[in-house]
Amino acid sequence: MKKVAVVGVGETRFTGPQTKTEVELFAEAATEAMAEADLKPQDIKALFIGNALGDFEEGQGMIESYIAENIGCLYVPANRYEGACASASMAVRDAWMWVASGYYDIVLAGGVERAATMGTGLATRTFAMFSDARYEYPAGVTFPAVFAMLTHLYADTYKIPLQKLREQMARVTMQSYKHGSINPKAQFFGKNADITMEKVLGSFVVSTPLTLHDCCPFSDGAAAVVLASEKVAKKLTKKPVYITGTGQASCGPLINQKDYLPRIRARELSSQQAYKIAGITPKDVDLCELHDCFSIASLIASESLGFFEYGKAGEAWEKGEADIGGKVAINPSGGLKSKGHPIGATGAGQVYEVTRQLRGEVEPGRQVPDAKIGMTDTLGGDGGTLVNMILERGW
């Protein structure tokens, strides 16, 4: 396969309810990405768009076609990907495969969502459809409840007192808020930098033991990336960032992973694929934008990705090993918790952040020193879809 590089990235700020439509939001991100690479819409050979809830948010189906027309890519092949929170990661991964195959040399990928505009009630109800409609959804399953159960299971499996685990989870939240507060693209930019553990633990209970500050927000936003073959990339940028490995796995309902929980076996398999293709190990990763939809999810993900021993991730956060300057910098963007979670755009937003980190373009206080290898991690549903990507500096 051919080498594939990220040559341009663009992103809106992730926010609460927006007045712009999803087509308009994506156009903003796509225009920025193309401008970075000094490309015009007619240079784009195909579009790959993540969008999970647009049918319910705006009553708009087939959004990929309207996005293509709106950004000046009329008649260009356009595809939409739906994998819950992993939608944009699926889109970027598929775009990578098309360029790696040699079929296209320049493509645009990304995602868009207006989940905040839906409001918490409608967003929660429609989002729950990403659980199994045969068994989980009829039982009233919501994702805060799923991760609350995983929190109890984690505490029991690794013999950690629940209050101690909650304090470790609070440190995850505090770190995410710290980074997000200085990220101009983040939903909580300028907010919560000095939040205390007491405030995190004392916020109202969403699903015991998870409190408000354990949970990420619904967000509106879009992100886009331009991918190009190595030959083309060298003509477009002096700082190509190569996607050197990808992985994806699915498992259906969470019960299929019962022999592994609270580990997410699909994530282990997906990340192992990515590591193998890239020819690296977890020890080589300088930073990772991982799927912290809930604070417990950060602990579970960082262990499944191989960064920390099972049951020990909370201790790693306590020691600063998951922060900038530690063993591996986790979510220097602020992650889903602080940067925000526009469902169908989140994965592309992770690629945006890792790319800028590797290029050394991030604001002081968030920049990972001399970062050479970064990773993305997105989870769709309650573990039903996992996508991982490895990005490396190409100069």
How should each PLM-predicted stretch be described?
Residues 54-62, 255-259, 292-315, 326, ...:
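Short glycine/threonine-rich loop-to-helix capping motif typified by GTGT followed
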Residues 41-51, 77-83, 107-112, 166-174, ...:
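Beta-strand segments within the central parallel beta-sheet cores of soluble alpha/beta enzyme folds
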Residues 1-23, 133, 137, 157, ...:
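Condensing-enzyme catalytic core mediating Claisen C-C bond formation in acyl metabolism
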Residues 1-86, 94, 154-168, 172, ...:
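Conserved active-site "lid/cap" helical segment
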